[in-house]
Amino acid sequence: SGKPVLHYFNVQGRMESIRWLLAAAGVEFEEKLIMCQEDLDKLKNDGLLMFQQVPMVEMDGMKMVQSRAILNYIATKYNLYGKDTKERLLIDMYTEGMTDLYELFFKVILAPPEEKDAAKSLIKDRAKNRFLPAFEKVLKSHGQGYLVGNKLSKADILLTELLYMVEEFDASLLANFTLLQALKTRVSNLPNVKKFLQPGSQRKPFPTQEMFEEMRKF
């Protein structure tokens, strides 16, 4: 049924985790980037966006929307979603926690200038004292190379994506979390992920405030 087609802006945003997951699963995909208002209007007018918003992924004969639903479909299809309901619960719990931290990065971009420092301080505090210790503890108590079971899952891939984001924001935040550093290295060295991390891949830049302002006009 051909390659999946991803419809989104030329930034990370809510599509980047989908790009990571497809890449890790070894699935080649195409992108139709939304570069102007007309591109988005066409998708809407053609009735392709259920809720009039992106991301949207064309895959297996479907027009899929809502990023978490898309991620769950891909994870299920490519056996990255645990072996039973208990493992799926853990994967969901962990990825929802990642989303909570991920959302704080968007708040920094959207914060007015006088609130940016406070928003950055909040990320540092939450990363260092809440989220990263929780994931480090999971790896330590689980005693395996991965977060759930002894097998790569959606949770490991999305955590690796998040760790790159944290590192780019402030590398010192990862200093005390040796198991998270090891997980990041392990996942990054998987052949499909390694390829995705090379320059010239379909990875996207983290959005600047200017990019966000442009996208919000649409």
From Swiss-Prot:
The modification N-acetylserine is found at residue 1. The modification N6-succinyllysine is found at residue 3. It holds the Pfam family GST_N. Glutathione binds at residues 8, 44, 53-54, 66-67. Residues 84-206 form the GST C-terminal domain. Residues 2-82 form the GST N-terminal domain. It comes from Cavia porcellus (Guinea pig). It catalyses: RX + glutathione = an S-substituted glutathione + a halide anion + H(+); prostaglandin A2 + glutathione = prostaglandin A2-S-(R)-glutathione; prostaglandin J2 + glutathione = prostaglandin J2-S-(R)-glutathione; (13S)-hydroperoxy-(9Z,11E)-octadecadienoate + 2 glutathione = (13S)-hydroxy-(9Z,11E)-octadecadienoate + glutathione disulfide + H2O. One of its GO terms (cellular component) is cytosol. It comes from the Eukaryota. It is found in: Cytoplasm. Glutathione S-transferase that catalyzes the nucleophilic attack of the sulfur atom of glutathione on the electrophilic groups of a wide range of exogenous and endogenous compounds. Involved in the formation of glutathione conjugates of both prostaglandin A2 (PGA2) and prostaglandin J2 (PGJ2). It also catalyzes the isomerization of D5-androstene-3,17-dione (AD) into D4-androstene-3,17-dione and may therefore play an important role in hormone biosynthesis. This is Glutathione S-transferase A. Keywords: Acetylation, Cytoplasm, Transferase.
